[in-house]
Structure formats: C-alpha cells, structure tokens
Amino acid sequence: MKGYFEQLKDSELVFVGYGVNAPEYQWNDYEGLDVKGKTVVILVNDPGFATKDPALFNGNAMTYYGRWTYKYEEASRQGAEGAIIIHETAPASYGWSVVEHSWTGPQFGFVREDLNKGRVAVEGWVNTDVAKELFANAGLN
C-alpha cells in the first residue's frame, strides 16, 4: 500500500495499569474498561515487579506479560488504536536513554495483508516525568 500511514487525532487516553490480561494469574487490567478506538497508557513490566511476590507473575523476574511487544499486542486485541508505555528504569531494567536512542526517528514496517491488526496503529513511549505531566493536565495524580 503505497503511502499508507496511521494517525490518531484527539484520541481519548485510558490508563490500564500494566495492560495485562492473564487468566492463569486471575489478572485482567482491561476488565470493565472500554478502550475501543482509544489510546491506552500502560506501565512497563508486569504486576509481579511491584509486589516482589514470587507467586505473582514470578515476582521480580519479568514474564512475557511485562514485555513491550506483549503490551502493544494486547492493546490491539482489546480494540485500542494506540498505546503509550510509561518507562521507568528499575522495572524496565534499562534506562530511558535506551528507549530514546533506539527509536530516534520515524519507524517503518511492512504493511501485511491483515493491515497489521496484531498491533495498535500508533505505538509510543514516555518517561515518568512526561507521564506525570499528562496525568496532572488531566486532573489526575
């Protein structure tokens, strides 16, 4: 598809915690939320990191549910159009500079026959300071 690109304008932001739907852990951050056509804002890693409980998502060890690729895929399965991951160094296990310098320009990919339905249309990252500003501007903390 020559000239194909995605754009979201005035997309509503919905905070979805870790953005995890894991039936085997009886965990679903999307339960009761309507994210269809919206942009989800997601914490990096998985719920086990915050609790350090080894019985919950392997505790401090990141599971597949903590990976950024999973978060974009799950957001798409839930009907979101965009997803923004909030980066924090400790739970990500790498600094903001890795994110900042890994994707420093436009990102291009091939448009598959399914129009890349396995991922949200727009993917992004913000650091904690920007996330705090977003929430403050929305009247949230």
What residue ranges belong to the model's regions?
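Detector for Asparagine
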Residues: 21, 28, 45, 58-60, ...
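Long, well-ordered, tryptophan-enriched scaffold segments
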Residues: 77-94, 100-104, 108-141
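Flexible, low-complexity junctional segments that flank or bridge functional domains
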Residues: 55-66, 70-77, 96-99, 103-109
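Second-shell loop/turn segments in exported
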Residues: 1-4, 15, 25-30, 54-72, ...
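Mixed-charge, polar/low-complexity N-terminal
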Residues: 15-16, 20-22, 58-59, 104-106, ...
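Noncatalytic luminal/extracellular "stalk/propeptide" segments of secretory-pathway proteins
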Residues: 1-54
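Structured segments of extracytoplasmic/periplasmic soluble domains
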Residues: 17, 33, 43, 71-74, ...
